[in-house]
Structure formats: structure tokens, C-alpha cells
């Protein structure tokens, strides 16, 4: 999985996109996402952060044994998976107008996107604790490093969208500009739906 992602990130057009589609399965992609999601949320707990749905409190019987509310984490994980399936369905409905493509392949592309979106969060969270430690001794440099990480994260989100476009093009061979417009609309639309959902349950 690590080799597939490395090739996709650094050599997407030549071999990366085709390699990850041919060598990874839905199971391997889901397993990788589960691993990095778990690590990310463990890091969030260690640095004292909150998950996206932290205001939604629904007591579970297991909470008294683990010392925190588990429901926001379950909701966060479930929402990411459902969004991934929803994006795959939108891609399937759209691209089957022009060409025949299996839903399972588009689900793989959507899961790849989901995995990629977790990586910048992992890097940021992994470095957040050292930055907090540095802030005690040098607030200026700590803030400068943190702002740099935010900038890199913003750039990485754009590059991840580009990789999503490359994967869809390699799979469907539909017009690149059309795919780019579709991806922008879908990602912005999904983000807006997430925000509406968060506001409605908070």
C-alpha cells in the first residue's frame, strides 16, 4: 500500500495511477484508511484536540470504561465512509453517461481519495505536539512552523484533488476539463453538505 501511494503521489501520470488501481483492493484500501484514521484520532486525543462531531454527545455504555465519549468518533468514522461511498455513486452516475465503468472501481478511486486526505492530517498532528513544546520556549518560531504546516496542508489538498482527477481520467478516458469541473463541484458540494450536517446536529 505504501509503495502504491508513493508511486501515485510522485509519479501519477506515468505509472502511479495505474499501479494503485491494479494492485490494491477495496479491502487493502479500507484497511489502510482504518489504520491511519485510528492513528490520527489517537494523536488528536494526545494533543487535546476534538474530532469533527465532538459536540454531539450520545452516551454509550462503554464510555464509563474508556473515560471519554466514543459516539463522536463512531459518527466521524461512519460519515467518512458514507461520504466515500456517496462520491463513488456520484462518479458512477456521471461517468456512465459517457462510458461504461464499474461501481467497484470508482469506489476504489473514492477510497484512495479518502486515504490521501488523511495523510496531511497525520503529518500535521504528528508535528503538533513538538510545536506545542517549542511554543513554550519560542512562540515566534512555533507560530511560523505552524503557519507553514497550514500552508503546506492547503497545497496538499489541491494536489490531492489533482490526483483524484488523474485517477478518474485513467479509469474513464473522459475529457480532462470535464472531469476537473466535476471533481471541483463534487468536492465543494460534499464539503458544504458536511457543514450543513454538522450545524444541524450540533
Predicted regions and their residues:
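Hydrophobic alpha-helical transmembrane segments and adjacent short intramembrane/lumenal linkers
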Residues: 99-201
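Interfacial helix-start motif at the membrane-water boundary
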Residues: 62-84
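Hydrophobic alpha-helical transmembrane segments
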Residues: 76-91, 154-161
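Membrane-interface interhelical loops and short amphipathic "cap" helices
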Residues: 52-70, 132-142, 198-202
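Helix-loop junctions at the membrane interface of multi-pass solute transporters
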Residues: 19-20, 92-98, 167-170
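Membrane-helix interface/capping segments
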Residues: 52-58, 84-101
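N-terminal juxtamembrane cytosolic/stromal segments of multi-pass membrane proteins
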Residues: 1-70
Amino acid at each position: 500500500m505504501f509503495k502504491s501511494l508513493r508511486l501515485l503521489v510522485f509519479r501519477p501520470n506515468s505509472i502511479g495511477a495505474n499501479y494503485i488501481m491494479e494492485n490494491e483492493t477495496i479491502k487493502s484500501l479500507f484497511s489502510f484508511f482504518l489504520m491511519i484514521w485510528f492513528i490520527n484520532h489517537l494523536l488528536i486525543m494526545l494533543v487535546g484536540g476534538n474530532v469533527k462531531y465532538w459536540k454531539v454527545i450520545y452516551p454509550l455504555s462503554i464510555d464509563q470504561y474508556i473515560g471519554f465519549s466514543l459516539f463522536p468518533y463512531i459518527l466521524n468514522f461512519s460519515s467518512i465512509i458514507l461520504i466515500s461511498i456517496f462520491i463513488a455513486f456520484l462518479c458512477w452516475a456521471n461517468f456512465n453517461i459517457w462510458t461504461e465503468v464499474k461501481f467497484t472501481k470508482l469506489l476504489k478511486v473514492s477510497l484512495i481519495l479518502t486515504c490521501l486526505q488523511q495523510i496531511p492530517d497525520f503529518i500535521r498532528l504528528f508535528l503538533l505536539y513538538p510545536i506545542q513544546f517549542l511554543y513554550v520556549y519560542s512562540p515566534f518560531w512555533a507560530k511560523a512552523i505552524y503557519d507553514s504546516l497550514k500552508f503546506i496542508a492547503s497545497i496538499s489538498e489541491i494536489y490531492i484533488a489533482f490526483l483524484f482527477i488523474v485517477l478518474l481520467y485513467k479509469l474513464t478516458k473522459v475529457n480532462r476539463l470535464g472531469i476537473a469541473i466535476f471533481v471541483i463541484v463534487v468536492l465543494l458540494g460534499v464539503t458544504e453538505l458536511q457543514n450543513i450536517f454538522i450545524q444541524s446536529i450540533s
